[in-house]
């Protein structure tokens, strides 16, 4: 049976932004909140970076994708990846 990893000294869990603010529903129209979960290239940040729970990450991902469809947030594309 594999052993659990113990955190390294000085390492701590990432703060959960949604839990800190008491947000239970992630709205696709709340662009200011969603931008915190997107990189400068327009990609969705990983859970280990954001500190979200799996369920919260799914909700944020769904909201970001809906906001992209409504042209509120940018899509990551080849031009954004190459710096054009």
From Swiss-Prot:
InterPro entries assigned to the protein according to its UniProt record, in alphabetical order: Ribosomal_bS18 (IPR001648), Ribosomal_bS18_CS (IPR018275), Ribosomal_bS18_sf (IPR036870)
Keyword field contains rRNA-binding: yes
RNA-binding listed as a keyword: yes
GO molecular function terms noted in the UniProt entry: small ribosomal subunit rRNA binding; structural constituent of ribosome
GO biological process: translation
Alphabetical UniProt keywords: Ribonucleoprotein, Ribosomal protein, RNA-binding, rRNA-binding
SUPFAM superfamilies: Ribosomal protein S18
GO cellular component, one term: cytosolic small ribosomal subunit
PANTHER family: 30S RIBOSOMAL PROTEIN S18, SMALL RIBOSOMAL SUBUNIT PROTEIN BS18M
Family label: Belongs to the bacterial ribosomal protein bS18 family.
Role, per record: Binds as a heterodimer with protein bS6 to the central domain of the 16S rRNA, where it helps stabilize the platform of the 30S subunit.
Subunit architecture: Part of the 30S ribosomal subunit. Forms a tight heterodimer with protein bS6.
Name by which UniProt lists this protein: Small ribosomal subunit protein bS18A
Species annotation: Frankia alni (strain DSM 45986 / CECT 9034 / ACN14a)
